[in-house]
Regions:
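Phosphate-binding beta-loop-alpha motif at adenosine-nucleotide cofactor sites
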Residues: 30-48
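Phosphate-end processing signature that detects enzymes handling 5′-triphosphorylated RNA
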Residues: 43, 51-222
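Long, hydrophilic "mature protein body" segments
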Residues: 21, 30, 36-37, 61-62, ...
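Short, well-ordered coil/turn elements that cap or connect secondary structure elements
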Residues: 28-30, 206
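Short amphipathic alpha-helical segments, especially helix-boundary/capping motifs
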Residues: 26-27, 122
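A glycine- and Lys/Arg-enriched "phosphate-lid" helix/loop adjacent to the NTP-binding pocket
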Residues: 1-26
Length: 222
């Protein structure tokens, strides 16, 4: 965060990197993590930060590109060792429609010994554009929402491994119903997509409806 109270930093490059790594590690479990890198000028960094905020609150804004890949099951322990990946256990439940233009879901997320709960709503406009809003909720509200669950869909359990390399953010979703495959998400600006070493990509599934979360809730397979 930028403010006028920060002291000047005079540490070596190595120490600066160590501090930045610790900061990223501390925030890596946050459900709305965005990495604003130093590859652009200060003004562009501010613009990227503003765009990230708009994205989080569900307002139309230029969003980072998002690519999705079907991958061979990675060595999750190696992800932690090699990339300092943070593992987050999640359970996502889709709710019955009350508005045909609004998809609703709730998520239970385990952070260490604590559980967090979120309500998410994805709305689609008549022009085809959509935005997503998400807010934290109490355990009591979460349980109440579960009573509105879509009975035609399964709850989706997964462990999400989050890490960053350079200006890009990576997420790997591992599901209990698949022992051989997982899903890799790559977030970042630009068309070129650098994939982490040690990850075997089977194919890109960015626009494949079969690998959307709602489809996985229906078929429970990769």
């Amino acid at each position: 965060a930028y403010n006028y109270g920060n002291a000047a930093r005079y540490e070596s490059v190595e120490v600066a990197r160590e501090k930045d790594d610790k900061t990223l590690r501390a925030w890596s479990r946050h459900p709305a993590l965005h990495v604003i890198d130093n590859s652009v000028n200060f003004e562009e960094k501010i613009n990227r930060g503003i765009a990230a905020i708009f994205s989080i609150i569900g307002q139309p804004a230029p969003a980072q590109s998002k690519r999705k890949y079907l991958i061979a099951m990675p060595d999750t322990e190696e992800l932690v060792r090699r990339y300092n990946a943070a593992a987050v256990e999640m359970m996502q439940t889709y709710l019955a429609y009350t508005n045909p233009q609004a998809e609703r879901r709730v998520r239970q997320q385990r952070n260490g010994s604590e559980y967090l709960y979120f309500y998410t709503e994805k709305r689609t406009n008549s022009d085809g554009t959509c935005w997503v809003t998400e807010r934290p909720i109490s355990e009591k509200d979460y349980i109440a929402y579960l009573m509105e669950g879509d009975s035609s869909l399964h709850a989706v359990r997964k462990t999400k491994y989050r890490f960053a390399l350079g200006s890009r953010r990576y997420e790997i979703d591992v599901y209990p119903f698949s022992t051989e495959r997982a899903i890799l998400f790559v977030y970042g600006d630009g068309a070129d997509c650098e994939l982490p070493e040690g990850i075997e990509v089977l194919r890109e599934v960015t626009d494949d409806m079969e690998y959307k979360n709602r489809s996985l809730a229906r078929v429970q397979r990769l």
